[in-house]
Design a protein with these regions (language model features):
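Short C-terminal tail/terminal secondary-structure segment
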Residues: 83, 174-176, 187-201
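Substrate-binding pocket helix/loop in short-chain dehydrogenase/reductase
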Residues: 34-35, 42-47, 156
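A conserved structural motif in NAD(P)-dependent oxidoreductases
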Residues: 145, 159-171
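Short, small/polar-rich loop/turn modules that mediate ligand/substrate recognition or access, typified
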Residues: 24, 110, 115, 186-188
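Alpha-helical segment proximal to the catalytic Tyr-Lys
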Residues: 63, 107-108, 184
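Residue(s) in the substrate-gating loop at a strand-loop-helix junction
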Residues: 78
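Active-site helix of classical SDR
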Residues: 58, 94, 102
Length: 201
């Protein structure tokens, strides 16, 4: 993520539209590693993506949000922020830091009328799962399940209470709510979109 490119993009948006009402920060990906086998380079890459994937866009578009009638920033985060997994230690740590950053920005930007919230994703159906299915299907192991049946089996293995993966439009609806005037009195909050996987109170 290049800061200069974001600054250029923000300038182009300002010239065309004048301001923006909402900024959605969605830089993600999961790194499978334990503490012991996470390299220094992997730590830096993970923290850079999760932190500066929010910091740089927010810095670039903050002036445009400050002149909006209903400014909102929404960050896409993960349930790992509150429920770390030992096989995803770097990602879990970075996600927890991002959650704290959201709270901090919400407090600081409140006086400007800019709301800052986030959503915490559970397991959402996406292209990465299709790739994993295709890889399993092309392996030497017997594999006759359909993609849908394979996803359902994974949902059972993961003990997702709603017994299925989330659909992309479901977190999108949560993002729309937090970005819109419908949530005009909400800041520093998170919406859990995990199918009931959350164990926190």
């Amino acid at each position: 993520l290049e800061k200069e490119q974001l600054d250029i993009f923000a300038k182009a948006v300002e010239e065309r539209f004048g301001n923006i009402n909402a900024l959605i920060n969605n830089a993600g990906g999961g790194r499978v590693s334990t503490f012991s086998n996470t390299t220094d380079e992997a730590w830096v890459a993970e923290l850079n993506l999760k932190f500066f994937g929010v910091i740089y866009p927010t810095q670039a578009f903050l002036p445009l949000l400050e002149v909006s009638d209903n400014p909102s920033i929404v960050c896409v985060n993960s349930l790992l922020a509150l429920q770390p997994e030992p096989h995803m230690v770097a990602t879990s740590a970075a996600r927890a830091g991002l959650l704290n950053l959201v709270y901090s920005m919400a407090k600081e930007f409140a006086r400007k009328g800019i709301r800052v919230n986030s959503i915490l994703l559970g397991t959402i159906e996406s292209g990465q799962w299709q790739k994993r299915y295709d890889k399993a299907k092309s392996s030497n192991e017997p594999h006759t399940e359909s993609y849908e049946a394979w996803l359902n089996q994974l949902a059972k293995q993961k003990n997702i209470p709603l017994a299925r993966f989330g659909h992309p439009e479901e977190p999108a609806k949560a993002l729309l709510y937090l970005a819109s005037p419908a949530s005009s009195y909400t800041t520093g909050s998170t919406i859990d979109v995990s199918g009931g996987m959350a164990k926190h109170i």
